[in-house]
Amino acid sequence: KNGTVKWFNAEKGFGFITSED
């Protein structure tokens, strides 16, 4: 899957990814 990370919180270790299928 290809996607772009819009936001990533390294402190918590997660982020929001917008994937274009």
From Swiss-Prot:
Keywords attached to this entry: Activator, Cytoplasm, DNA-binding, Stress response, Transcription, Transcription regulation
Main location: cytoplasm
GO CC term (a single one): cytoplasm
Pfam families xrefs: CSD
Cited SUPFAM superfamilies: Nucleic acid-binding proteins
A GO MF label: DNA binding
Full protein name: Cold shock protein CspSt
Organism: Streptococcus thermophilus
